[in-house]
Design a protein with these regions (language model features):
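Bacterial N-terminal signal peptides
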Residues: 7-21
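A catalytic-pocket lid/entrance helix-loop region that shapes and gates access to the active site
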Residues: 111-116, 212-309
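Glycine-rich nucleophile elbow surrounding the catalytic serine of serine-hydrolase chemistry
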Residues: 197-210
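Alpha/beta-hydrolase fold catalytic core
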Residues: 291-443, 448-449
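Short alpha-helix in the alpha/beta-hydrolase fold that links the catalytic acid
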Residues: 437, 451-461
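Catalytic histidine-centered segment of alpha/beta-hydrolase-like enzymes
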Residues: 478-489
C-alpha cells in the first residue's frame, strides 16, 4: 500500500510539471557521455607537438537504445593538423582480459610516460617521475586509449551486468560499437585507421578488425604487441605438446640473458636460429614418439635441451622432456633461491617457498604495478582534470575469472566450436577481404606469456597468398612482454611504428 501511494504521489508531481520540464526531468535521469578537455605538449624527434587531450565517456546502448555501459577513454589529437579529419587515428588497448589501457598510455605510446628502470629492477617507492614521452606516436597518429567494460572507469549501466561484456564475442561487439560511435561522433570516418592491441588485446584485435570491416569500416593497419591468437600454442595441457616446442626458444633466450649457459653464446639471434631448428625438427619428433622413443634418443635430446636452457640433463629426463613455463621460471635460478617473471623473465626476485615448482606471485607485476597505479591516478586527476567517484580499476580480476571463451569463427553459420579458442581465421579473413590491410607484429625475446616463436607459428598459420604475405611486418626486441619497459626497445618500437604507419597510409592507390 505504501509503495502504491508513493507511485501515485510521483505521478501527481509529474502531471503538475510543464511538458518541457517533464522531458528535462526524464533526460536528466538518463546517463550521458561526459568529457574534460585539456591541452599539452610533447617533444618527439626534437619537435614540440601541441595536442588536445579529451578524457571522457561514451554511452553504449542496446538495440532498444537503452543505455547498457559507460566506456571511458582518453584521446590525444595533434593540434594544427592540416585537414584534421584525414589525419591517422589509432585505437589502443591492453589485454587481460580485465586490464585497463594504463600500460600502453602511461608506459608506451601516450604523450606522458612513467619512468621505470630499463634494467628490470624493481621500481622504488613514490614519488614517481611522469615525464615527456619522446616515443609517443602522436608525431604520426592521433590515439584513443580505450578501457573495456569492467576496467578503468568503464562499467555496466542499469540492469546490464558484466556477463553481457565479458567474453570473446561480447567484448568484440562492445569495443566495436564504441569505435563506431567514436568515429561518428568526432567525424573520423575518412581518417586512416589503425587498431593497436597488446597481449589479450592482440586476440581481441584479430576478431575486432574482422567485425569492424564487416560493418563497412575499413582499416589501414593492425598493430600487435606480444601476441596470442591461438591458445593451443600457449596452453600447457595434457595431450598438447605444441607449447613445449614453441616455448623452447624463449627458454634459451632467457637462459642466455641470465648467463646460465656454458659456453655463453655471443650472438643471441644466431643462437636462437639453432634452437628454433632443433625445436622444429629433433625436439618435436621426439615428443611425437612418446613411449616409443628409445632411451638412447631420449638421452641425446635431453643433453641438447640442457645445453640450450641451462637446466640439467637429469632434470629434463625427470620431466619426460616436457618443462612448462612455471617449472622453468622456478628452476632456472633455483640455486640462488630466485624465480623469474612470466611476462618478462628479465625480472627476478626471491622465491617465497623455494621448494615449489610454480611462482607464488607475479614477479614483474610486483616490480612495476605500484608505479603505474600511482601514476595513472595522479595523472588523470591532476593533468587531465578528470575526477570520478569510482575507483580506477587498473586490473579487474573478476573479468578474467568470469570470461566466456567461446568464439564463433567466421564462415560458420552455427555457434562456437569446442577446443582451443583461435582467432587466426578472423585475421586471415580480414586481410583477404581488405587486401590493402597491413599487419605489424612485435614480440619480445624474454616473454613467457606470449613467446615470440609461438607468435611466428600462429602468423605462419594465416596461410596468406604470397602477395599478402608482403603486408606482414615482424619485429623482435630484447625485452619481455611489455616492450616499452626497456628504453632502447621502446625507441626501436617507436621507429618501427613510425615506418609502419607511413607504409600503411601511403600505399599505391
Amino acid at each position: 500500500m505504501y509503495i502504491k501511494r508513493c507511485a501515485l504521489f510521483l505521478l501527481l508531481i509529474m502531471a503538475a510539471l510543464p511538458t518541457h520540464d517533464l522531458y528535462a526531468a526524464i533526460q536528466s535521469s538518463r546517463p550521458s557521455a561526459n568529457s574534460v578537455i585539456t591541452h599539452g605538449t610533447v617533444v618527439i624527434h626534437g619537435v614540440t607537438i601541441h595536442y588536445t587531450a579529451r578524457a571522457g565517456t561514451l554511452i553504449l546502448r542496446n538495440a532498444l537504445q537503452v543505455p547498457i555501459a559507460s566506456v571511458f577513454y582518453v584521446a590525444y589529437w595533434k593540434d594544427g593538423a592540416r585537414n584534421a579529419a584525414n589525419r591517422p587515428i589509432t585505437f589502443a588497448y591492453n589485454g587481460g582480459p580485465g586490464s585497463s589501457s594504463v600500460w600502453l598510455q602511461m608506459g608506451g605510446i601516450g604523450p606522458r610516460r612513467v619512468m621505470v628502470p630499463s634494467d628490470a629492477k624493481s621500481v622504488p617507492p613514490p614519488p614517481y617521475d611522469i615525464s615527456n614521452n619522446p616515443y609517443s606516436i602522436l608525431d604520426k597518429s592521433d590515439v584513443v586509449f580505450i578501457d573495456p567494460v569492467g576496467t578503468g572507469y568503464s562499467h555496466p549501466l542499469g540492469k546490464a551486468t558484466g556477463k553481457q561484456f565479458w567474453g570473446v564475442d561480447q567484448d568484440v561487439h562492445s569495443m566495436g560499437e564504441f569505435i563506431i560511435d567514436y568515429v561518428s561522433k568526432f567525424d573520423r570516418w575518412n581518417s586512416p585507421k589503425f587498431l593497436l592491441g597488446e597481449s589479450y588485446g592482440t586476440f581481441r584485435t584479430a576478431a575486432l578488425i574482422n567485425y569492424l570491416q564487416n560493418q563497412g569500416m575499413q582499416f589501414n593497419g593492425v598493430i600487435l604487441l606480444s601476441s596470442v591468437l591461438n591458445f593451443e600454442a600457449s596452453s600447457f595441457q595434457p595431450g598438447n605438446d605444441l607449447p613445449y616446442i614453441l616455448f623452447l626458444p624463449s627458454y634459451a633466450a632467457i637462459a642466455w640473458y641470465h648467463h646460465a649457459l656454458s659456453p655463453d653464446p655471443k650472438n643471441l639471434a644466431a643462437f636462437l636460429k639453432r634452437v628454433e631448428k632443433f625445436a622444429i625438427y629433433d625436439y618435436s619428433t621426439a615428443l611425437l614418439q612418446g613411449d616409443s622413443l628409445s632411451i638412447n634418443q631420449e638421452d641425446k635430446i635431453a643433453a641438447k635441451l640442457s645445453e640450450y636452457t641451462g637446466l640439467s640433463q637429469s632434470y629434463w629426463r625427470k620431466a619426460d622432456l616436457r618443462v612448462n613455463a612455471d617449472e622453468f621460471e622456478t628452476a632456472l635460478l633455483s640455486r640462488q633461491g630466485l624465480v623469474t617473471g612470466r611476462l618478462d623473465a628479465r625480472y627476478v626476485n626471491y622465491a617465497v617457498n623455494p621448494l615449489l615448482s610454480f611462482r607464488e606471485y607475479p614477479v614483474m607485476a610486483s616490480a612495476i604495478d605500484g608505479a603505474f597505479t600511482s601514476a595513472v591516478n595522479y595523472y588523470l586527476r591532476n593533468d587531465l582534470h578528470y575526477i570520478s567517484s569510482r575507483p580506477y580499476l587498473i586490473i579487474n580480476g573478476d573479468v578474467g575469472r568470469h570470461w566466456d571463451w567461446k568464439h564463433k569463427p567466421p564462415f560458420r553459420s552455427f555457434g562456437a566450436r569446442p577446443g582451443f579458442t583461435d582467432v587466426v581465421p578472423d585475421l586471415r579473413r580480414a586481410m583477404i577481404t581488405n587486401p590493402h590491410l597491413q599487419l605489424m607484429v612485435n614480440a619480445g625475446y624474454f616473454d613467457l606469456g606470449t613467446p615470440y616463436f609461438a607468435t611466428q607459428y600462429t602468423i605462419n598459420e594465416l596461410k596468406l597468398p604470397a602477395q599478402l604475405q608482403k603486408h606482414v611486418h615482424m619485429y623482435h626486441y630484447y625485452v619481455g612482454h611489455m616492450l616499452y619497459l626497456n628504453t632502447p626497445s621502446l625507441a626501436a618500437l617507436h621507429h618501427n611504428l613510425d615506418r609502419f604507419i607511413d607504409i600503411s597510409v601511403r600505399q599505391k592507390r
